[in-house]
């Protein structure tokens, strides 16, 4: 049976691609990802890469993060980061604009794990409960994260205990996202 997060992420990604097709007349495009190898690349044109999501292969999990910190990660975060390769996706959740973080390639998956380890080490040092980032916001100090203990999706201020619950689960958060073609 497919994990609920995988289904919710696939549904959001399809809404995102459809939004780009309807508003821009082409696949999602990025200048920031131009020149970076990925199985997602459909076409490079001038300084822009046009991409389409691809299945994550070979099968993987965030085992490196778990081993490095001797911690068990919430199953939702494994599903989220290993379901597909894609570019980051702009979205809105209620009035919150965010960039849903995605894995672009196998190399990017390694980098993402290193960043998650750094994030969790900082939280441990500050004696904060563990969270795993999922999206960036317009502010460099706030991010959308998954609480590793409850599975809730929260808006957190980096390095502080300041947290606001956005959704009870990652699947609920993904189903509540509206794509933005920017």
From Swiss-Prot:
> Chief subcellular site?
membrane
Q: Which domain of life is it from?
A: Bacteria
Q: Does the keyword Membrane apply?
A: yes
Where in the cell is the protein located? Cell inner membrane
**Matches recorded under Pfam families:** Syd
GO CC, alphabetical: cytoplasmic side of plasma membrane
* Covalent S-S links between cysteines: none
Sorted UniProt keywords: Cell inner membrane, Cell membrane, Membrane
How does it sit in the bilayer? Answer: Peripheral membrane protein
State its role: Interacts with the SecY protein in vivo. May bind preferentially to an uncomplexed state of SecY, thus functioning either as a chelating agent for excess SecY in the cell or as a regulatory factor that negatively controls the translocase function.
Which family is annotated? Belongs to the Syd family.
Supply the HAMAP family for this chain. Answer: Syd
Q: What is the protein's name according to its record?
A: Protein Syd
- Gene name of the record: syd
